[in-house]
Curated annotation (Swiss-Prot):
UniProt domain Thioredoxin: residue ranges: 1-158
Name of the protein in its database record: Putative thioredoxin peroxidase
Residues the record marks as active site: C45
Assigned EC number: 1.11.1.24
Organism per entry: Encephalitozoon cuniculi (strain GB-M1) (Microsporidian parasite)
Summary of the function given for this chain in its UniProt record: Thiol-specific peroxidase that catalyzes the reduction of hydrogen peroxide and organic hydroperoxides to water and alcohols, respectively. Plays a role in cell protection against oxidative stress by detoxifying peroxides and as sensor of hydrogen peroxide-mediated signaling events.
UniProt key word Signal: no
Main EC class the enzyme belongs to: oxidoreductase
Family: Belongs to the peroxiredoxin family. AhpC/Prx1 subfamily.
GO cellular component: cytosol
C-alpha cells in the first residue's frame, strides 16, 4: 500500500492569500502531512482545517508542514478561505490548500473515492526524505484527530532518530502540543 517512490509534480495552491505553484520537493528536509479532504464548503472539513491551523506552532516545532489537499480548484479554496470560521469557513488558514486537479496525489495512495467523486478523508505522513511513513483514512463523516497526527510525527521522529520502536499509546516525553 505504501508507494516506494512518489511521483511529484507542480501543484497550484492557495498559500498566504496568493495562488502559487508548489511541489513536494519544496519540503525535502521536513516531515510533510498530506491532509486529503473531500470538498470545500462542507461541514467536517473546516473543523479539521481550522484545527491544523490552530496547531501550526506544534507542527513547526517538529519541523513539519501540512498540505491541505482536495480536488476542488485553487479558486474555490481561495473563496472558502475568505469565509469566517463561524460560517463554516477557513479564514486565516495557516497551511497551503492544494488543488489536486488531475487526482495525481490522491491516486498514488489509492485515496480517490470514485463512487463519490472526491478524495477520501485521509492522512499521509512523509519523512524528511519524502518516504511514506503513515497512511490512514476515515469514513467521510468522521473527522480526524490532529492531536493524533502530532503524536504520530513524534513517533516517526523518535524512530528516525533512535531506530527504536513505539508501542501502542507511545507518547513523546516532550509534552508541548
Amino acid at each position: 500500500m505504501f508507494p516506494k517512490t512518489l511521483t511529484d509534480s507542480k501543484y497550484k495552491a492557495f498559500v498566504d492569500g496568493e495562488i502559487k505553484e508548489i511541489s513536494l520537493q519544496d519540503y525535502i528536509g521536513k516531515y510533510v502531512v498530506l491532509a486529503f479532504y473531500p470538498l470545500d464548503f462542507t461541514f467536517v472539513c473546516p473543523t479539521e482545517i481550522n484545527r491544523f491551523s490552530d496547531l501550526k506552532g506544534a507542527f513547526l516545532r517538529r519541523n513539519a508542514v501540512v498540505l491541505l489537499i482536495s480536488c476542488d480548484s485553487v479558486y474555490t479554496h481561495k473563496a472558502w478561505a475568505s469565509i469566517p470560521r463561524e460560517q463554516n469557513g477557513v479564514l486565516g488558514t495557516a497551511w497551503p490548500m492544494v488543488w489536486d486537479a488531475k487526482r495525481e496525489l490522491c491516486n498514488q495512495f489509492g485515496l480517490y473515492d470514485e463512487e463519490n467523486g472526491h478524495p477520501m478523508r485521509s492522512t499521509v505522513i512523509l519523512a524528511k526524505d519524502l518516504s511514506v511513513r503513515h497512511i490512514s483514512s476515515n469514513y467521510h463523516a468522521i473527522g480526524r484527530s490532529v492531536d493524533e497526527i502530532i503524536r504520530l510525527i513524534d513517533a516517526i521522529t523518535f524512530n528516525d532518530e533512535n531506530g527504536d520502536i513505539c508501542p501502542a499509546e507511545w507518547r513523546s516525553e516532550n509534552k508541548d502540543n
